[in-house]
Structures are given as C-alpha cells and as structure tokens.
C-alpha cells in the first residue's frame, strides 16, 4: 500500500491545532518494492535533517509532566502559547496557530512511568 497527500509548506511536529500552511505541490518520490514484505505498521525513511534549518537562533522550550501523556502534551503546548503571546504581543489564538505551523511537540521521557515528560520546542528564528 502507498499513500501520499495533504502537502504542507510548513507544519510543526504534532500539528497541535489542526492547522498547517496548506499548499499545492508537485511531488517526486522513489518507491522500492519489497515483495512479500509484512510490516506491522507504516514506516518511512528520510534523508534529514528534519529541523536543522530552524536551529540558528535557538529555541524556547516548555515542558509538561504528569501521569497522563495527553495532559502533559497539553500543558507543554499551553505553556508555549502563553510564552509566545507574552513575548510577542500576539493574541493567544495567533500564538496557538503559529505554534502549530513551526513548533515541535516531542515526547522527552517515558522511562519514569507513570510520569510522562513532553516538551514543546519553538524555534526563535521565526520571530526574526
């Protein structure tokens, strides 16, 4: 099975508010057929780096920690939305949408179960 679609000019890892910068694209892909392969879940390979182009000005990062992974993610996102709004003068909604298109939501730690740690990284370069 092969699936391709929903191209974006930019989207943060997590697409936290369901928005990205939608755009039409022409796409060229290379497909290797692996006959009789049985994969238990989707997989892909990328040349990377995935986000290094944002690294030059550093990041703001917020963290959520708790027994519920989803709540920890919400706490990390909420903290970043508040920080971006405060630092830039944007409304909370504007900051939320900006976080969705350029920030990255990452699971930072799962070994200390039931305390999940989730971090949200906002690349400061997008603010100029």
For the regions a language model picked out, list residue spans one by one:
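Glycine-rich anion/phosphate-binding loop at the beta-strand->alpha-helix junction
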Residues: 1-44, 78, 87, 92-93, ...
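A hydrophobic, small-residue-rich beta->alpha segment in the mid-to-C-terminal subdomain
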Residues: 46-98
């Amino acid at each position: 099975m092969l699936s391709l679609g929903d191209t974006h000019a930019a989207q943060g890892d997590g697409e936290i508010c369901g928005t990205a910068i939608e755009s039409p694209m022409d796409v060229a892909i290379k497909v290797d057929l692996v006959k009789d392969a049985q994969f238990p879940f989707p997989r892909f390979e990328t040349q990377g780096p995935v986000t290094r182009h944002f690294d030059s000005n550093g990041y703001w990062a917020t963290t959520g920690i708790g027994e519920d992974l989803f709540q920890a993610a919400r706490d990390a996102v909420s903290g970043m939305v508040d920080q971006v709004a405060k630092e830039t003068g944007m409304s909370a909604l504007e900051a939320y949408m900006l976080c969705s298109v350029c920030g990255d939501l990452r699971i930072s730690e799962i070994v200390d179960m039931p305390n999940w740690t989730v971090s949200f990284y906002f690349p400061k370069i997008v603010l100029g």
